[in-house]
Amino acid sequence: MAGSSSLLRAGIRNVLLMQMRRSSDQLGELGKGAGKGGGGGGSVREAGGAFGKRQAAEEERYFRQKEQEQIASLRKHHEEEIRHHKGEIERLQKEIERHKSKIKKLNDD
């Protein structure tokens, strides 16, 4: 269980890093603008300058928050699965004891 969550966490982190690298290859430094000219006249981030840097920082914050939400959701899901399986184990152990008592009763007769 712990291995799968760490693999998923590493996978999410790798995907985000790849996205950041792709965008940083295209833009140079995040928020600096498109190419050396300082922006393409499109979005705020492409325009560069202080607003571009702010937009880049907000995007990074957004993705970090989404990653944390996904990890929390996954953790909750695994905890629910563990709780369910523990309940199943208890139920099956009671069934085993019930069958053992039936066998013992048959042997005693």
Swiss-Prot record:
One of its GO terms (cellular component) is mitochondrion. The keyword Cytoplasm does not apply. Residues 1-22 form a transit peptide. Endogenous F(1)F(o)-ATPase inhibitor limiting ATP depletion when the mitochondrial membrane potential falls below a threshold and the F(1)F(o)-ATP synthase starts hydrolyzing ATP to pump protons out of the mitochondrial matrix. Required to avoid the consumption of cellular ATP when the F(1)F(o)-ATP synthase enzyme acts as an ATP hydrolase. Indirectly acts as a regulator of heme synthesis in erythroid tissues: regulates heme synthesis by modulating the mitochondrial pH and redox potential, allowing fech to efficiently catalyze the incorporation of iron into protoporphyrin IX to produce heme. Homodimer; represents the active form and is present at a pH value below 6.5. Homotetramer; represents the inactive form and is present at a pH value above 7.0. Residues 99-109 have a biased composition (Basic residues). It is found in: Mitochondrion. Residues 27-109 are annotated as: Disordered. It holds the Pfam family IATP. Keywords: Coiled coil, Mitochondrion, Transit peptide. The gene is atp5if1. It comes from the Eukaryota. Disulfide bonds: none annotated. Residues 71-109 form a coiled coil. Forms an alpha-helical dimer with monomers associated via an antiparallel alpha-helical coiled coil composed of residues 78-109, leaving each N-terminal inhibitory region (residues 27-56) accessible for interaction with an F1 catalytic domain. The inhibitory N-terminal region (residues 27-56) binds the alpha(ADP-bound)-beta(ADP-bound) (ATP5F1A-ATP5F1B) interface of F1-ATPase, and also contact the central gamma subunit (ATP5F1C). Residues 55-69, 77-98 have a biased composition (Basic and acidic residues). This is ATPase inhibitor, mitochondrial. Residues 78-109 are annotated as: Antiparallel alpha-helical coiled coil region. Residues 27-56 are annotated as: N-terminal inhibitory region. Belongs to the ATPase inhibitor family. GO terms for biological process: erythrocyte differentiation; heme biosynthetic process; negative regulation of mitochondrial ATP synthesis coupled proton transport; protein homotetramerization. Its main location: mitochondrion. The keyword Transit peptide applies. Residues 30-43 have a biased composition (Gly residues). GO terms for molecular function: ATPase binding; ATPase inhibitor activity; protein homodimerization activity.
